[in-house]
Structures are given as structure tokens and as C-alpha cells.
Amino acid sequence: MDRETILNAVKEARKNAKPRNFNQSVDLIVNLKELDFSRPENRIKQNVILPHGRGKESKIAVIAKGDLAAQADEMGLTVIRQEELEELGKNKKNAKKLANENDFFIAQADMMPLVGKTLGPVLGPRGKMPQPVPANANLKPLVERFKKTVSINTRDKPSFKVLAGTEKLNDEELAENIDAILSTVARQYEKGLYHVKNAYTKLTMGPSVPIKE
């Protein structure tokens, strides 16, 4: 799938979507073929840094205490301290809500055993286990990276949907973001994009448009 093919699909998707009074997401849907997803090595679980960013803010939660929690507070991030973490371990409904509301999690390294015990059963299946950092870490570079990052997680299914940006990005930027995602998929397999059965792009309120040669 060359850049021109992707670009044409993006233009078509934008044209077919009805205008809305919010910044619509642009998604990429990929269906894979001739792979046995009961074998873990065929599954994709990868973060992709989009060259033109997500087009909207990433929601990031930091599990920390002391200075690291204070730093996260100053940056306006969601902060989960030890007491709250222990409470979440007892309340699965609230734990699921937290998992669904945030795109990425960062955790102070010495709190990871407690994170695994309390939130592991909720975050693990969603592919959202926290990035561990030392207590004296500078969060800014990691947060800046997460602001441009999306996650591919096929689990045991031969398909995935992932954010490629929003309609506020121009067509060329969206095409480059989609190309970056597809390049990540290609690197996972010896036969590269041969294993892509088909791919589509769409805006939130629009129909799916095939990316075809």
C-alpha cells in the first residue's frame, strides 16, 4: 500500500463523513490473514509513534507517591496514590472505569508489585500495563512521547482498530500516520503486508473506505 493509495482513501473518508461539531477521530481498521492467532508470536502488541501526533490529547494516569506524584500533579496528569490504588483493587467497577478513561499508565517502579496485584487483571487484558519509571524520573519526555503514541493490540483476533489522528490533521499528515502504523505491522511478519487481508479508514461519523491499490 503506497502513500498515494492511502492518501486517496483518506480524502474519500473525509469527503464521505458528515460534518459534526466536534473533532472527529480518524481510525484505521486492519484485517489480517493466514496467521494463527492462538500462537502468541503472531499477535501484535506494539506502540506506534505517529509522525504527526494523535490530533488530540492522550489521557495519561500516573501511579506514584512523594515527589513523582507531585510532579505529575503539576503537569495536570491523573495521579493515583497508594491509598487509592489499594481501594481500586477492591472495586473492579472503578478500576475498569479508570482503565477505559486513560490511554496510557506510568507507575513508580517500586509500586509495580502492588499495581500488578490491584490493577493487573484490568489493565493487562487491555494492553495498558504501566510503563515503570524510577522515583526520581523526569516525566516530561515520556509524557511527550505518549502524546504522539497509539497502541496496536490484536490479542487473539485477526483484526484491530487504531486511532490514526483526527480530522484537524490534513490529508497528507493522516496518510503519513497510517503509513507509520502499516509499516509497524509489516515489520512484525516475515512476509510483511502480505498478511494484511484488507484495510479501511473512517471518520467517527462516516463510513469505512477501503485502502486499495
UniProtKB/Swiss-Prot annotation:
One GO biological process this protein is involved in is: translation
Record-level Gene Ontology MF annotations: rRNA binding; structural constituent of ribosome; tRNA binding
Q: Name one GO cellular component term.
A: large ribosomal subunit
Which InterPro entries does the entry link to?
Answer: Ribosomal_uL1, Ribosomal_uL1-like, Ribosomal_uL1/biogenesis, Ribosomal_uL1_3-a/b-sand, Ribosomal_uL1_arc, Ribosomal_uL1_CS
Q: Which Pfam families match?
A: Ribosomal_L1
Q: Which UniProt keywords apply?
A: Repressor, Ribonucleoprotein, Ribosomal protein, RNA-binding, rRNA-binding, Translation regulation, tRNA-binding
Please give the positions of the paired cysteines in each disulfide bond.
Answer: none
Q: Which family does it belong to?
A: Belongs to the universal ribosomal protein uL1 family.
Query: How is the subunit organization of this protein annotated in UniProt?
Result: Part of the 50S ribosomal subunit.
Briefly state the protein's biological role: Binds directly to 23S rRNA. Probably involved in E site tRNA release. Protein L1 is also a translational repressor protein, it controls the translation of its operon by binding to its mRNA.
Q: Which HAMAP family match?
A: Ribosomal_uL1_A
Protein name as catalogued? Large ribosomal subunit protein uL1
Q: Which organism is it from?
A: Methanococcus aeolicus (strain ATCC BAA-1280 / DSM 17508 / OCM 812 / Nankai-3)
